[in-house]
Amino acid sequence: MYSSRWLDALFVASAAILWFMIAYQLLLFVTGYLYSRRSAWITPTLAPGLEWPAVSILVPARNEARVIARTLEHLCAFDYPADRIEIIIVDDGSQDGTGAIVDEMAAQDSRIRRLQVPAHLGGRGKSAALELAVAASKNELIAIYDADNCPEPGSLRALVAILVSNPSLAATVGKFRCINRRRNLLTRFINIEGLAFQWIMQAGRWSLLGLTTLPGTNFAIWRNVLQEVGGWDKDALTEDAELTIRIYETGRRIRFVPRAVTWEQEPEKLRTWFRQRTRWARGHNYVFAKHARRLLALRPRVLAMDLLHALLLYYAVCAAIFISDLLFLLAGSGLVSLHAIGPYSHIWLLAFLLFVLEVGITLSREKGEDSFFNLVLVVCAYFTYCQLWLIVVIRALLDDVVLRRKRVWVKTERFSDVRSP
């Protein structure tokens, strides 16, 4: 049996990194939970003397025939002055009848129009499509939705009310829900993950630090802000996260508005999930490479802190989990011996219980999600679903650092037989 001091040191260092992040996560959980309690009693309304501004709703679409009609139905059903809305579907070279569906619905509702991306500019990803749409839009307020979204009627109204009533805000971000969450085990895990992210990371960071990350859909932003920061980065696979940093550097903020809800499809196949999550991870690699070198110069300071947290979460924590898992397996098989002194088994048990407690309480903020079955899934996710992220991060690092593969936008597979919420 092999043993050495460096193995013990490696194990202790991994435990220290994990517990530092667990402590910070616990703080975000508490502040996020308190924010969820406060926001439950707040109905977003316009400040006195203000009027509802005209909004351009932009929807990038590439081969979205399965879902685009339902999305347009929901966008047209917004509880918002009808004469203050234009809906632009950015058709990025669709070959499945998406354009024909949009044209048919546009003939019935004058607010809808299709913007065809020129062939020589097509297939360059969401950022490029949105840039074309902004240039073609006419209103000062921009709202972004993905082509599979089913926003609730009051969603746009909530986003706009908070944004217009607070001059310090550059954008407002709503909440997304998983429309196909009951389809299979994977979508149930994704549903739990999404709720935990929003009520812990989004709500917690907003309440504690005044920070929120643009999620890529269900958000409203001022046109002049987009112009000031130079629009979307066309090289970014996670254009929302990259844009968030540049917005905060202007001194403005982005607010999480949980009353603004949209329902979206999530991957139903593990293969689709890996493709999507790898794109996210590679997108974050790009963001880190672009902005991490300016870490000490970033303003406000909380922005630098948040980027550092993201770096630790993606790399240090994943490395610590991988190392601790590996040492645990090697020690359990008798190949190595660890002699680090400390109540590590009790610490691990406490970390596990905190995970279950935090996510379980978070689920209680959503109607119908705090079931015993979901609590069992939370326990299972700790040992299964959460560990899949290790593979995603390693795969993304291999693609970017070792193999240096070209970053290409990978469209997420859609499913047509999902009922509206």
What positions do the PLM features span?
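A conserved acidic beta->alpha catalytic loop
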Residues: 82, 91-100, 119-121
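Juxtamembrane C-terminal module of membrane proteins
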Residues: 27-50, 293-309, 327-421
